[in-house]
């Protein structure tokens, strides 16, 4: 019965763990934070003053954006591997397909971010070389592009998020179905085991009652034997004492007779003395 309980508990726990993998209030994944940082970095290029723009090096901008792209892809890869690891026990086929889909979407996101890096480097160079009147035109184009970039990055992020949600929902459904199937399959065995345990407890209870009755009877027999032994001991003691009293009486009898004789002599002497007294006239 213990093994059935453990197996059934594991099945229920599996369903609970699967549901916990997809929660609406889950914190934002690290890779999404990196995408937001990338876009903010690009959009801030259009807000820099002319003097600050002149101090920014194109190579420096390219390296920093490359770093953000690399970090984003690394976080997204780690996120994908973590999801695949968690999904494999419940749906290995879906986990493998999710990994492939995320690779395609990650490639699309990387392409858009790389394009944004190249465009930003190009715009920076134009801002440095254009005259003041043309600089405004470049800034307008930068502003337009950053708005479009925001939409593209949001779309890429949303596609990844929706893809993950779809697979998580499927996995949750499978896990729930498996848990219900296991429950239905093992419920008769659980009931049978429970009935067996109840019968065993009943048998044990009857055995304990029988043993208790046997012990009670043994105690009654022992108590009766002890009573008889005590009565026998008391009778022996009484007989012994009676014998001692008779013996003591026999020993004291001569002395009693002698005392009576002496008392009688004393009484006779008193009578004689009384008779000898003169009679008053």
From Swiss-Prot:
The keyword Repeat applies. It is found in: Secreted; Secreted, Extracellular space; Secreted, Extracellular space, Extracellular matrix. One of its GO terms (cellular component) is extracellular space. Residues 1-18 form the signal peptide. The keyword Repeat applies. Belongs to the apolipoprotein A1/A4/E family. GO terms for biological process: acylglycerol homeostasis; cholesterol efflux; cholesterol metabolic process; chylomicron remnant clearance; high-density lipoprotein particle assembly; intermediate-density lipoprotein particle clearance; lipoprotein biosynthetic process; phospholipid efflux. APOE is an apolipoprotein, a protein associating with lipid particles, that mainly functions in lipoprotein-mediated lipid transport between organs via the plasma and interstitial fluids. APOE is a core component of plasma lipoproteins and is involved in their production, conversion and clearance. Apolipoproteins are amphipathic molecules that interact both with lipids of the lipoprotein particle core and the aqueous environment of the plasma. Residues 19-24 form a propeptide. Keywords: Extracellular matrix, Lipid transport, Lipid-binding, Repeat, Secreted, Signal, Transport. Sequence repeats lie at residues 67-88, 89-110, 111-132, 133-154, 155-176, 177-199, 200-227, 228-249, 254-281. Homotetramer. InterPro entries: ApoA_E, Apolipoprotein_A1/A4/E. One of its GO terms (molecular function) is identical protein binding. This is Apolipoprotein Eb. Residues 34-66 are annotated as: 3 X approximate tandem repeats. It comes from the Eukaryota.
